[in-house]
């Protein structure tokens, strides 16, 4: 495997002990950190490989994470900024990134000829649970298990998965088999979900959800330029709500009914603050609370400037532009 496409490349040059690392192939994105390569299909791949050479990669994501934890134990500062590069293939790992064992500001990058080449499908539980700050997840095709999320972001008592970026990923509900796409548990702040695709999640199995708010609600979340289609519930809440967040440039498509009709496009819940900006999106279906669009209950959200197909509503102009929050 030659790792034909590495998003935000490159990281390989300049590692100690790697033959040919003095060859100029571009600039690193971080002054610190190591790069670990995972390729379950490579003939040289093992769980005990060094992993810093793409020709001698690790065979599982779990093995790469164990290497990163060991490096972090040796040098907390130098471990920051490390990257896990995953080659095309199917991976069944279930990973929990905690604040004690793992460094902040690291990346998990899927490489290949499209964003769908790296398939992460755990047998059970969350594919990836993050309780550390500043991680970047890019280019992964998540197929969540029946009892877990593709990516779960946690935060409680002032610490957790703040500043996470999830981009260029496909959250595939597998026609109702997967539980959640992205799950917020608690209130990680300043998280970004952008340029992703969500599809095929069933009733009570939403694409993006908040399941618990022990201290607060997700704050300054950015949900940008994503596509939501063929699911019953898109962005919803089981606890709390979104605060001071931006939902912009997304495309919400009414399901064709293979799983069921879309019942929830956006429900921002009952958080303590509100002030969410929901602008510049395309809204399919019935632009109303009954149709599945619900602003935060404090009444201070801004929903002006979306395009909605439902021009019959008083909150939608004749040109299809929303002029107010959705109403009953």
What function would you assign to each model-found segment?
Residues 79, 100-104, 123, 132-133, ...:
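Parallel beta-helix/beta-solenoid
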Residues 18, 38, 86, 93, ...:
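Extracellular beta-strand solenoids
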Residues 62-77, 91-101, 126-130, 152-156, ...:
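Short, T/G/N/S-enriched strand-turn elements that build extracellular solenoid repeat scaffolds
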Residues 36-41, 59-92, 106-112:
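Glycine-rich repeat segments that build the extracellular carbohydrate-interaction surface of secreted
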Residues 170-231, 235-238, 242, 247, ...:
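Solenoidal tandem-repeat scaffolds enriched in leucines and small polar residues
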Residues 94, 103-152, 173-175, 201-202:
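Right-handed parallel beta-helix/beta-spiral solenoid domain characteristic of secreted/periplasmic
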Residues 2-63, 307-311, 327-328:
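Right-handed parallel beta-helix/beta-solenoid
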């Amino acid at each position: 495997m030659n790792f034909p496409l590495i998003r935000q490349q490159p990281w390989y040059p300049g590692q100690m002990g790697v033959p040919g690392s003095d060859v100029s192939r571009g600039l690193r994105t971080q002054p610190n950190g190591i790069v670990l390569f995972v390729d379950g299909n490579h003939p040289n791949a093992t769980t005990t490989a060094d992993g810093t050479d793409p020709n001698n990669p690790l065979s599982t994501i779990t093995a790469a994470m164990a290497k990163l934890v060991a490096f972090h134990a040796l040098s907390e500062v130098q471990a920051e900024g490390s990257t896990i590069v995953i080659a095309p293939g199917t991976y069944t790992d279930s990973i929990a990134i905690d604040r004690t064992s793992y460094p902040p500001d690291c990346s998990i990058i899927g490489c290949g000829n499209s964003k769908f080449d790296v398939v992460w499908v755990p047998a059970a539980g969350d594919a990836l649970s993050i309780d550390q700050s500043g991680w970047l997840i890019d280019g992964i095709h998540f197929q969540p298990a029946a009892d877990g999320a593709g990516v779960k972001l946690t935060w409680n008592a002032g610490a957790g998965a703040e500043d996470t970026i999830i981009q260029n990923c496909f959250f595939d509900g597998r026609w109702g088999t997967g539980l959640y796409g992205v799950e917020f548990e608690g209130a990680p702040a300043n998280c970004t979900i952008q340029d992703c695709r969500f599809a095929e999640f069933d009733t009570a199995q939403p694409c993006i959800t908040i399941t618990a708010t022990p201290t607060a609600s997700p704050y300054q979340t950015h949900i940008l330029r994503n596509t939501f289609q063929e699911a019953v519930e898109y962005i919803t809440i089981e606890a709390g709500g979104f605060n001071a967040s931006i939902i912009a440039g997304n495309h919400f498509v009414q399901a064709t009914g293979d799983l069921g009709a879309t019942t929830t496009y956006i429900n921002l819940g009952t958080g303590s603050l509100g002030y969410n900006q929901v602008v510049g999106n395309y809204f399919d279906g019935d632009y109303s609370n009954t149709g599945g669009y619900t602003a935060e209950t404090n009444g201070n959200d801004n929903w002006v400037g979306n395009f909605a197909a439902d021009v019959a509503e008083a909150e939608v102009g004749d040109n299809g532009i929303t002029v107010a929050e959705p109403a009953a």
